[in-house]
Amino acid sequence: MTLNATPTPSPKLLEPKDHTLILIDFQSQMAFATKSIDAVNLRNNAALISHGAKGFGVSTILTTVAEKSFSGPMFSEITEAFPGQPLFDRTSMNTWEDAAVIGEVNRIGKKRIVLAGLWTGVCIVGPALSAIAQGFEVYVIADACGDVSDEAHNRAMDRMVQAGAQPMTSVQYLLELQRDWARSETYDMTTGIAKKFAGSYGIGITYAKSMFGASEGH
């Protein structure tokens, strides 16, 4: 049988309107003990996906655990991207067991769930496995998650992937939403977010535009 290639994307690729992003427990108490990623990279990656999601109009849920009594506020890099958006504060370590959060998931009504947060082995594994068990497609932004050790993070990622979750990175998430530099309506936003938060890739964009007036869409 001869295969016939067509210039069309895989249905596995994310679109801005086909998923819900859930940002979980990006809070001081969890960050203090996170060792699998340094705090600077973690905050940059959290900011990148937050500003990307906001700019592309992705349905986003922000949730914390014991914010006032133990864990502290959500990272300002995230809340600044979603000014005025309410946060769902929980007692459950597994976000998927919180009725208010699940009510919001159902209200939004998307079959794809993208997860990021702290810690990978507790507050990300729980909702990932639970959502998969209920028939949702789950994606996990691995470098916008963290745990108390590399071992804890890596084993959690292994467990989720073995259950059917699809791993990705923060820059991959942003560029998957853009996907075509000819999409001029989001071009400046995407490159602006990358310049600010995407490390050496962002430096490269700044250099190319400054030195050569580069524009990827042409």
Region locations from a protein language model:
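Glycine-rich phosphate-binding loop at the start of an alpha helix
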Residues: 47, 99, 121-125
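Short phosphate-binding loop-to-helix
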Residues: 90-103
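A contiguous pocket-lining binding segment that forms or flanks enzyme active sites
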Residues: 111-170
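Active-site acidic carboxylates
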Residues: 1-92, 107, 137, 157-161, ...
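Distinct, well-ordered alpha-helical segments
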Residues: 71-78, 101-102, 127-129
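Short alpha-helical
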Residues: 69-70, 96, 122
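Glycine-rich phosphate-binding loop signature in dinucleotide/nucleotide-binding domains
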Residues: 105-111
